[in-house]
Amino acid sequence: MKKKLKIGMIIAYVVLILYAVVSLFPFLWSAIVSLTPMRYTENCVTTGTDIMKWPPEINLFKWPPEFFGAPATGENYVQVFKITPYARWILNTIIYAALVTIGHLIFDALGGYAFARLRFPLRDLWFALFLATLMIPGHVTLIPNYNLMVRFGFVNTYYGLFLPKLTGVFGIFLMRQFFMGIPREMEEAARIDGASIIKTYFKVVLPISKPAISALAIYIFVGTWNDFLWPLLMTSRKEMFTLTVGLDFYRTSYYTYWQYMMAASIMMTIPMIIIFLIFQRQFIDTGVSSGVKG
């Protein structure tokens, strides 16, 4: 029995290691390409999947990779800031992600508390219908939302980016589940002491809900930081691009500046890695606990 268990553990570890290698290889490839001097691939032209290359340049897409022989340089990272308004794109992305996250924390918590504690006609039916909207693909609402933003004149503005994203069904569901797990006696004690429902919400419920709020904030911020489709629709001026949209700036009809694109991608990814490493415990613990309560 112990021998079978040991073999099973070995197989499991091998599978996990292989999965980790496969998952990390694209990031490793991006990091190496971002450090490869531009002169080593400046004659490498990409058109779709076809690659035309003149020696002695390095082919970034050859297997096994041959770019390990190129001397590493940080020049590509410097050039990203010189040839594009990358600093402005960082600012745009931070503003976009921060405003959307703040909106979700406010409205999702209020909506979740309403469904968890307030009594109103057909509350459970409304909540079921509300959850049913999760089955509607997000792409279905893209055109209506875009038309509304165009009518309001919010294209190429921060308003157009964050207003349609200020709340979401998943966030309300997450907060509602967490609120359902809070003992009612705590709120009733506050009400007996003379606290209004609003004061009870802010002084009792929200402080207890910091783990769920933290998890929701991380989830929304990371998702918004990596959002591509909506910023692509709402921004046409280079100065209003977010980081995800700006990556396409390094590609033309005949040439892709892979070193610059990968350098920009690495700089875009690093903040998210740091956030996950710092808050991974709260994120995982809260994701498990709040998802099963109520």
Label every PLM stretch briefly:
Residues 2-4, 8-294:
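A structural signal for multi-pass alpha-helical bundles of membrane permease subunits
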